[in-house]
Structure formats: C-alpha cells, structure tokens
C-alpha cells in the first residue's frame, strides 16, 4: 500500500476510534523508511497510546482483583484471574516491544531535527516505563535503567535546543517526573523536576506563540496538579494517581 494511502487510512481509523487499525497503518508507514512529519508522528503516538492505554487500564484492574483474591485466599477466582492478567500483560509487552522496535530501527535514526529526536526519545522512555509497570525482579531493574537513559538523553537535548515553554519539552519533563515518582521511587527528584520545569516555563510564558499556548499551559497545569498531589503524599496525606501528558 502507498505511504499516502496508509496515512489517510490511519486518519480514518482515528475518526472511527479503531486504534489498533490506526496503529497498524502507522507501523506500515514508518516501515516505508521516510521521516514522519509533525502530524504523522502525532498520529503514530495517538494510535499506540490508545492501544496501550486500554491494556494498562485492564492490567491494573486485573492486578487489583488478583491481589484481593490472594488476600482472601479465594481458590475460585485465583487461577483464572492470574491467567487473564498474564494474557493482558503479554499483549501489553507485545505492543511496547513493537513501538520500541520502530523507534530504534527507524524513527530515532531518521529524526532530522532536535524536536523530532526529543519526541521519539520521550516516546522510548514512555514505553519502557509501561513495561516497567508490569515487570519484576532483575528484568524490572534493566527496563527502569533503559527508561531513565532515554528520558535523560531527551532532557539533555531539550534543554540545549528548545525553550522552556515548548510543549514537547514540557510533556517530556511531565512524564519523566511521573517516572521518578511512580517507577523509580524517587519522590524528591520527581518534585524537583516538576517544580523547576513549571517555574522556568512560567518565567518564559510571555514568549509563547498562540499556536503552542493551549498545549503548553495544559501541561503546566498537569505539572502543578502533580506537585500538589506529590507534596501532599510526602506530607503523609492520601494522594492518587499522577496524570501523564494527554493525547492531542
């Protein structure tokens, strides 16, 4: 199928909310070997984020049920819940491995500018983070190290090449701070990164273009929400789950 046709079908699949189809079309487009435009890389991101988002949500629900059934020593629920949770986990790993393969084989190598490179390295960090959510033991440690390395490389480039209000730089810092808090168990680092990012963006807000204003201020609000949540958690109050960067 022609590349232009694949992109068009991905857009149709998005409108029809058929995200697995959308992901398959975008995977085929990436494998054609051409650099993606800004619009095309967003299509790729939206497709896979929706596919993996459903799997992550299902895995959390099933893990919670499994934990409760283990605590209650319920033989009726136990094996079936574990079996189903493992099935979802296998599917989730498969999607993450597919995305990471596309990033390493095509997208990061073909990135022609700093913004694209940061976008894809952030994506690499995100999909290793999703793998870390379901990993255990030595495997988990290796995956966490891979996520941290991708996020850090993206941060280093973004600080040199992009203004503090750039929505891709802000989204990267948001997700890296969530990684520190929820995966790496480093709340101080999470709070420090979120606060520094928010403060630097606030100081630079007057330079924002109209095009970026909505995206940037939305991510800044999420950074502030997380700071409120995490500082309450650190003070011993009950918190909740931290929001990540939304899909545009």
Swiss-Prot record:
Matching SUPFAM superfamilies: 14-3-3 protein
Xref: InterPro entries: 14-3-3 (IPR000308), 14-3-3_CS (IPR023409), 14-3-3_dom_sf (IPR036815), 14-3-3_domain (IPR023410), 14-3-3_sigma (IPR037435)
GO molecular function, one term: phosphoserine residue binding
Residues carrying Phosphoserine: 5, 74, 248
Record-level GO BP terms: cAMP/PKA signal transduction; establishment of skin barrier; intrinsic apoptotic signaling pathway in response to DNA damage; keratinization; keratinocyte development; keratinocyte proliferation; negative regulation of innate immune response; negative regulation of keratinocyte proliferation
Cross-referenced Gene3D superfamilies: 14-3-3 domain
Keywords for the protein's UniProt record, in alphabetical order: Cytoplasm, Nucleus, Phosphoprotein, Secreted, Ubl conjugation
Name of one Pfam family that matches: 14-3-3
Cellular compartments annotated: Cytoplasm; Nucleus; Secreted
A GO CC term attached to the entry: extracellular region
Top-level taxon: Eukaryota
Residues at the site labelled Interaction with phosphoserine on interacting protein: 56, 129
Modifications after synthesis and translation: Ubiquitinated. Ubiquitination by RFFL induces proteasomal degradation and indirectly regulates p53/TP53 activation.
Family: Belongs to the 14-3-3 family.
Further facts: 14-3-3 proteins have been shown to be PKC activators, but this effect could be non-specific and only due to the acidic nature of the protein.
Function: Adapter protein implicated in the regulation of a large spectrum of both general and specialized signaling pathways. Binds to a large number of partners, usually by recognition of a phosphoserine or phosphothreonine motif. Binding generally results in the modulation of the activity of the binding partner. Promotes cytosolic retention of GBP1 GTPase by binding to phosphorylated GBP1, thereby inhibiting the innate immune response. Also acts as a TP53/p53-regulated inhibitor of G2/M progression.
Oligomeric and partner information: Homodimer. Interacts with KRT17 and SAMSN1. Found in a complex with XPO7, EIF4A1, ARHGAP1, VPS26A, VPS29 and VPS35. Interacts with GAB2. Interacts with SRPK2. Interacts with COPS6. Interacts with COP1; this interaction leads to proteasomal degradation. Interacts with the 'Thr-369' phosphorylated form of DAPK2. Interacts with PI4KB. Interacts with SLITRK1. Interacts with LRRK2; this interaction is dependent on LRRK2 phosphorylation.
Protein name stated in the entry: 14-3-3 protein sigma
Annotated organism of origin: Bos taurus (Bovine)
Gene responsible for this protein: SFN
